[in-house]
């Protein structure tokens, strides 16, 4: 079937987020790890970290979030023409997560899309692919779904409290209340900042300080490339306060996002210093202006200056997007989109009409994009389904650091196993959650649904 009318207002029509039933408090983790109080909570900006034991994997959390999207939005699965998955949590070097999810589409085998992998960026690449499919001559009139999710865990050490778990499912199509703007700015580069070369371990190899610089560099370049497509001038930014009403980010830590929003303001300063004439004293200005670009990526005076200048706007325009991430930790591919969902929920539909929201997505290695959406319709039905007050409250249990460590140890024992039955408890799984029951002698996985 050839579509005669081009689709309008392509965007997000539904969102479901899966947050596991267990989390560990970061203050408790500080005490347990014997490190100074505030290092995880103030230094990283994190409050709680979601985790799972050996009962859940990327297949199960993807099945859970997608099945709930289908149920909560009464989706006719025959009217889905594209399904794509973004993840970096790989169970198989050949078989895709998307192929596992086809169980949820009985009678509909004509569904395009596959898995997209590059660190935390795969979900965003999948979203862009969905938009482009609907805009193309290949579109058959059906909607698309993007699933993004990961289990982010680290070996013992400084990076461990920056983990997390979660998944998101997005229903994408025309005539949506949350509409994608046509402008995007991307930045891609070869970098060994975070990668997973060891298939015998779930843990990544991380160059922490370098990765932070890569993230900030990506923020700069994506913002410049986005702005250039609007202003026509490579040296002129759109103005973060003028162009965006709210901002969501990929959230490795909430503290990094606070600094990155301020970095957008720094780019506005470089673009038009005269706008900041009364805001920055001469000594500080001379210091900032004397920095090389590489020095600017890590300079503490620059950082402190613009974090201070952006403080009030950060609270209004960014903080709502951090409410969920600070309470779950990093969801990798789902992170930027859960940040958007958090913002929608905590700002509320009435305050979002005709507002533009920037979304910055970053994946190590590296791939990054700044895109934006405009809220053109009522999103109260979406925020009702999200129900973060319950999911972050009575919908889960805060466990001890000892319980968290025990869950991680179960996952270590389960990695790469066959002829295996998981040992973890299912007590904290919510109704409708998929969980692993067995891995047979050919590595085939079987699941049940919590009743």
From Swiss-Prot:
Induction: Expressed during exponential and stationary growth phase. Expression is repressed by amphotericin B and caspofungin. Expression is also repressed during biofilm formation. Pathway: Metabolic intermediate biosynthesis; (R)-mevalonate biosynthesis; (R)-mevalonate from acetyl-CoA: step 2/3. (3S)-3-hydroxy-3-methylglutaryl-CoA binds at residues 120, 162, 211, 250, 259, 330, 364. One of its GO terms (biological process) is filamentous growth of a population of unicellular organisms in response to starvation. Its EC number is 2.3.3.10. One of its GO terms (molecular function) is hydroxymethylglutaryl-CoA synthase activity. Keywords: Lipid biosynthesis, Lipid metabolism, Steroid biosynthesis, Steroid metabolism, Sterol biosynthesis, Sterol metabolism, Transferase, Ubl conjugation. SUPFAM superfamilies: Thiolase-like. Pfam families: HMG_CoA_synt_C, HMG_CoA_synt_N. Is a probable target for sumoylation. InterPro entries: HMG_CoA_synt_AS (IPR000590), HMG_CoA_synt_C_dom (IPR013746), HMG_CoA_synth_N (IPR013528), HMG_CoA_synthase_euk (IPR010122), Thiolase-like (IPR016039). PROSITE patterns: HMG_COA_SYNTHASE. It catalyses: acetoacetyl-CoA + acetyl-CoA + H2O = (3S)-3-hydroxy-3-methylglutaryl-CoA + CoA + H(+). Hydroxymethylglutaryl-CoA synthase; part of the first module of ergosterol biosynthesis pathway that includes the early steps of the pathway, conserved across all eukaryotes, and which results in the formation of mevalonate from acetyl-coenzyme A (acetyl-CoA). ERG13 condenses acetyl-CoA with acetoacetyl-CoA to form hydroxymethylglutaryl-CoA (HMG-CoA). The first module starts with the action of the cytosolic acetyl-CoA acetyltransferase ERG10 that catalyzes the formation of acetoacetyl-CoA. Belongs to the thiolase-like superfamily. HMG-CoA synthase family. NCBIfam families: HMG-CoA-S_euk. This is Hydroxymethylglutaryl-CoA synthase.
């Amino acid at each position: 079937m050839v579509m005669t009318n081009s689709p309008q207002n392509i965007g997000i029509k539904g969102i479901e987020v899966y947050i596991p039933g267990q989390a560990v408090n970061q203050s408790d983790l500080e005490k347990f790890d014997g490190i100074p109080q505030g290092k995880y909570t103030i230094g990283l900006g994190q409050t709680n970290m979601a985790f799972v034991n050996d009962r859940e994997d990327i297949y199960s959390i993807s099945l859970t979030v997608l099945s709930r999207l289908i149920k909560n939005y009464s989706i006719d699965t025959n009217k889905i023409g594209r399904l794509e998955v973004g993840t970096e949590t790989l169970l198989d070097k050949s078989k895709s997560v998307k192929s596992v999810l086809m169980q949820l589409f009985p009678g509909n085998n004509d569904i395009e899309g596959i898995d997209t992998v590059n660190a935390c960026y795969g979900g965003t690449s999948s979203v862009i692919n969905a938009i482009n499919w609907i805009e193309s001559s290949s579109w058959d009139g059906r909607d698309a779904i993007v699933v993004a999710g990961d289990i982010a865990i680290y070996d013992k050490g400084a990076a461990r409290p920056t983990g997390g778990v979660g998944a998101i499912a997005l229903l994408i199509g025309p005539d949506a209340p949350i509409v994608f703007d046509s402008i995007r700015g991307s930045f891609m580069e070869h970098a060994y900042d975070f990668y997973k070369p060891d298939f015998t371990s779930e843990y990544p190899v991380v160059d922490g300080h370098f990765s932070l610089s890569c993230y900030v560099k990506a923020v700069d370049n994506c913002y410049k490339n986005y702005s250039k497509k609007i202003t026509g001038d490579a040296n002129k930014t759109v103005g973060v306060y003028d162009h965006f009403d709210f901002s969501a980010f990929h959230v490795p830590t909430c503290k990094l996002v606070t600094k990155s929003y301020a970095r957008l303001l720094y780019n506005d300063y470089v673009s038009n210093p005269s706008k900041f004439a009364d805001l920055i004293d001469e000594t500080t200005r001379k210091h900032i202006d004397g920095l090389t670009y590489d020095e600017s990526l890590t300079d503490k005076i620059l950082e402190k200056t613009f974090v201070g200048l952006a403080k009030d706007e950060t609270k209004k325009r960014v903080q709502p997007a951090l409410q969920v991430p600070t309470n779950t930790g990093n969801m990798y591919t789902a992170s930027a989109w859960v940040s958007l969902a958090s913002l929608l929920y905590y700002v509320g539909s009435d305050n979002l009409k005709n507002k533009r929201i920037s979304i910055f997505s970053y994946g190590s290695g590296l791939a990054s994009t700044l895109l934006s959406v405009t809220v053109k319709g009522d999103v109260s039905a979406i925020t009702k389904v999200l129900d973060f007050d319950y999911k972050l409250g009575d919908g889960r249990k805060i466990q001890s650091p000892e319980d968290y460590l025990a869950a991680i140890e179960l996952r270590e024992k389960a990695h790469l196993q066959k002829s295996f039955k998981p040992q973890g408890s299912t007590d904290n799984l919510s109704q409708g959650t998929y969980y692993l029951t067995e891995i047979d002698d050919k590595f085939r996985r079987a699941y049940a649904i919590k009743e």
